[in-house]
Amino acid sequence: MEASTVRTQDHYVTFGRREGDEDFPNSLISGISTFLGAQVIPPVRDRLEEAEVKAAVLGLPWEGTNTCRPGASYGPRSIRRATEHYLSYHGEFQVDLFDALNLTDCGDVSIVPGNARRTFDRAERCITEIVEAGAFPIIFGGDDSCPIPVTSAMSKLIEGKMGYIQMDSHMDTAEAVAGETLNHACPVSRTAELPNVDGHNVALVGINGPLNPRVEREYVDRTGIQMVTIWDIDEWGIDKTIERVLEIAWDGTDGVVLHTDLDVLDQGFTTGVTTPETGGLTPREVIKMIRAFVRQGVDAYVITECSSVYDPANKAARVATRLALDALGVRANPAGTGRV
């Protein structure tokens, strides 16, 4: 009689072993690809509550408003594949993410091709179900319009004022692009318009380069949005930068949404992004900031612009994976040192 084994959380599914045979789980070449090999539960509140899920990932493979290099819709799948190189035990926080958070993969939002509004409505419903189940959501885009449904959903779920941090080389404060208000250049403006968001609680971190139009800077100045440029970071150092961003986003707010556009990193580290920029942050600098922000208390985290079609080594997806795993590590063990 041959045995069958299904152990998604251990990164693999194998069949054909005989009873008592030893098995070697190699997630790089076998198994069903979920985030870190996590169990799959749809974004349905009752199902997530029943499983006592404390953290869940959700893919939003949407790039229907992108005006730059394509490929970000492959981001969620690329990131899941990149997690095959990692363990559920995070040695720097001395915690197993499955044991501590019952980490779950909620799959992907069902995209409506060509229709941003309907796609974002679906995304909002999924995010709402996850949060109302008591789980911390990490959302993988998708282009830079993907934070729009995240902040929209969270603004309704957070009782009180909401802060927003966008780590990005670009301001993304366009009010519209060719008349379209859900464009990938508009996530910050759409967020700043929410009824419980004030501009002075919105932090743009890492802004740099010549792809920041005058009209977007005028919007920043007009609305009181706080901008921390790459040159501010260069002058202040990471620790002072973190202090400044904490002051901005948590000043009188009751919840904060964090967004990392992978192009905030120098393109030498993240080749596979939609809008690469030279002169950005290093992975270590971004990791340190992510840890500090999540430790302070982030209610949702979204990562965008992973476009593996330009990245044979899958570097951007691996960076995204590391950022997500460190955010989860802090959630699982806030008192952890973050060192092996």
Write out the residue ranges for each language-model feature:
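Conserved alpha-helical scaffold segments that buttress catalytic/binding sites
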Residues: 2-340
